[in-house]
Amino acid sequence: MDASTVQELLRGGYEKVYEAGAIIAGGHTIHGAEPIYGLAVTGFLHPDRVLTNAGARPGDVLLLTKPIGIGVLTTAQKAEMLSPEGQALAERLMTTLNKSARDAMVRYRVHACPDVTGFGLLGHSFEMAQGSGVELELNVDAIDLIPEALEFARMGLLPAGMYRNRTFAEPGVDAGVIELCKQDLLYDPQTAGGLLMAVDPADAEALYRELQGCVPSAQRIGTVREYRGGKRIFLR
């Protein structure tokens, strides 16, 4: 890897850190066979303003801020099967911060908010349901599944992480009659995925409208219910 490529990597990282309102305060170098780049975040947060993946309440409305399918797209890219349009979409989604969604969210009553990353939508939903002592109903038709990712899922082109996520969460999921390829995408590990918000029903419509102004891909995907025993997630 030449010096100009390294320079571009560092510049891109700096620009995103600056966009998030933070600063680069140091660094270190790792020698290895493959180039890697990452960031560790250190900061302070008022304990009364912490949002975790627990705290969702029955009646809450579930909002999701990004489409699903990034893991499948990046797997297809490694196999040199991804279209130029798919690559551009993946890059745009992965380089879009959750800052705008977060800035909108803090003005409303949001009871829980994991980011959807390596465990996929169903993995993080399962953790939220367990941690909150509730169950979730997800409307699969309302979830923005990336069309090209869905086609790859139908072909069986899936990341290894999808299978691990399925093993983890599937015992707690009632998939109903949902098509298998759509289930696969719901387990797809996301890189730089969106936020999954459990919103007080009195605030849900107003927050949803505000999110649509700054996060066009925002979706209203389900509801939180009282836990009745048994499964935690119900796909409809």
Residue map of PLM features:
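Helix-biased detector of long, well-ordered alpha-helical tracts
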Residues: 1-236
